[in-house]
Amino acid sequence: MILDTLENLGNYVSLNPLFSQVVDYIKMTDLASQPEGKVVIDGEKLFVNYCVAKGKTKEEAKLESHDKMIDIQIPISSTEVMGYTPRNVLPVNDYDYEKDLTFYDGLADQYITVHPGMFAIFFPQDGHAPCISENSEIRKVIFKVEN
């Protein structure tokens, strides 16, 4: 898991060959003005979801992980808290191959605060519980990057 500001995202391009395309896309795009929906950047290897999510309490937020994709999550409209638990301490649960998604019961071990202008990267080894906020809605951008 990585937490940093958007201006530093370029420092992480060596971690995945597709990260440089994410940096280029962000430089060319006003993320805040995009409508909800999916934008394909490089087939199913790299795409971005623009979404408005319902704000949740820590108890409502579900821990999740992905096997095939890395999440780069960027809050746009408001601060978002995200739970984190290393996947190796989570129980083995059913994996949805079609959605590349595993859910887990219980609360996260730790919580990070991600402000607009920041990002959080969650790798397959990172259990994460997004969308924790006192706001009823969170506008956010999620880049899905093939691992």
Locate the predicted segments by residue.
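Glycine- and acidic-residue-biased ligand/ion/polar-headgroup-sensing regions
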Residues: 68-70, 74-82, 88-90, 97-102
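Conserved metal-binding segment of the jelly-roll/cupin
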Residues: 113-127
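Short beta-strand His + acidic residue motifs that chelate non-heme Fe in jelly-roll/DSBH
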Residues: 82-83, 112, 127-134
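A short glycine-rich, His/Asp/Glu-containing loop-to-beta-strand
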Residues: 38-57, 63, 67-76
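A short hydrophobic beta-strand segment most commonly corresponding to one strand
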Residues: 119-121, 136-147
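Compositionally biased, non-globular sequence tracts
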Residues: 12-28, 96-103, 116, 146
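Long, hydrophobic N-terminal alpha-helical segment
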Residues: 1-40
